[in-house]
Amino acid sequence: MTNIRKSHPLIKIINQSFIDLPAPSNISSWWNFGSLLGICLALQIVTGLFLAMHYTSDTDTAFNSVSHMCRDVNYGWVLRYLHANGASMFFICLYLHVGRGIYYGSYMFKETWNMGVILLFAVMATAFLGYVLPWGQMSFWGATVITNLLSAIPYVGTDLVTWIWGGFAVDKATLTRFFAFHFLFPFIIAALVMVHLLFLHETGSNNPTGIPSNMDMIPFHPYYTIKDILGLFMMILVLLCLVMFSPDLLGDPDNYTPANPLSTPPHIKPEWYFLFAYAILRSIPNKLGGVLALVFSILILFIFPLLHTSKQRSMTFRPFSQCLFWLLVADLLTLTWIGGQPVEQPYIIIGQLASILYFLIIIVMMPLTSLMENHLMKW
C-alpha cells in the first residue's frame, strides 16, 4: 500500500513542497528567512484578524478603539504589540532575505526573484496602510504626506490624490478604505507567496557556493525542518522580548496623540523600515525627482539579473564584490539613520551623498567590479 503522504492528491503537494523536497546539503542559516517570513505572515494574519474584531474604522472612534483594545480587552495589548512588532520582525527578515539573495546570486532565478520583489512592494504597501489605522498624529500626517507624493505625477496627479483620499483631505473615507485594503492585502500576499514557492520549486534552491547541487541533495524533512524550528524559536524570543519589555521601542511617541489636522508634528517620519527610502526621497529638492528616486530605490531590485557580469554566481569567492556588498549595507544603515533626523545640515548633505552612493554601487560599481574579478581570474 502506498503511503498516503505520497498518494493523496492534496497531501502529496504538501509532501513535495515541505517533506520530500530535495534540498542542497550545504545551505546555511541565511536560508532560514523564507520560512520565518511565512511564519511572520501567518502571525500577522491571525493577530490582525483578532484586532479587526475590536477596531472601528471611523475617524471619531478609531483612536479610542485601539486604546480600548489595550486597556479593556483580555490580552488585547499582547495582540496589538505582537502585530506592531511582528511587522518589524517581518521587515527584518525581508531585508535579510533580499540581502542573502543579492550576496549569493539567487536573483539568477529570475521568476522567483521578480515575484519576490513584487511581494516586497505588496508588504510595504500593506505596512503603510496599517500605520494609518491607529489614527494618531503620525498616522494622519504620514498618510497625508505619502499619498500627497502622487500629486507629483503630471496631469493626473492631483485627481489621483483626491480619488485615493475620497475627498479633499485625509478623512473618514480615507481611513475606511485603508482599513479595507489593509485587511485584504495579506491574503493577496499569501497567494503571491504560493506563486513565489511554485517558481522556486521549479528550479530548486540556490546554495552558498552558487554551483548547481543536483548531485548532492538531502530531503527537506527532518534536516531543514529542525533547522527552521531553531530559527523560529530565536525569532520568537526576540519578538517576545520586544513585546514584553519594550513594545514601543520601534514606534513613534507622536502616535499616542490623537490625529489633529490643525497641528503638524515637528518631524514627520514613517516607521523605521521605510526610513532608508524616505531619506532618498528627501535628499532630492525637486518633488517629482524625489518620488522617482523613492520608487527606483526599490524597483532597482528588478534589474539585478541584468547587472550580473561575473562568471561566478555567488559572492562567496569574490572578495572585492563582498567589500562592495557590505559598503551597500553600511550605506543603507546610514540612510535609515538620516531618514529619522531633522532636515538640517549636516544631515542633508550626508543623505544626498548616501543616496548617490546607493545607486552608484548597484548600477556602476558592482558590475565593473565583477568584470575586474573575471579579468583577475583570467576568465
From Swiss-Prot:
Domain of life per record: Eukaryota
Keyword Transport: yes
Chain sites annotated for binding a ubiquinone: 201
Location of this chain's protein in the cell: Mitochondrion inner membrane
Chief location bin: mitochondrion
Positions of transmembrane segments: 33-53, 77-98, 113-133, 178-198, 226-246, 288-308, 320-340, 347-367
Signal as UniProt keyword: no
Entry binding sites for heme b b566: 97, 196
GO cellular component terms given for this protein: mitochondrial inner membrane; respiratory chain complex III
PROSITE patterns in the cross-refs: CYTB_CTER (PS51003), CYTB_NTER (PS51002)
Membrane topology reported for the UniProt record: Multi-pass membrane protein
Remaining remarks: Heme 1 (or BL or b562) is low-potential and absorbs at about 562 nm, and heme 2 (or BH or b566) is high-potential and absorbs at about 566 nm.
Protein name: Cytochrome b
Gene: MT-CYB
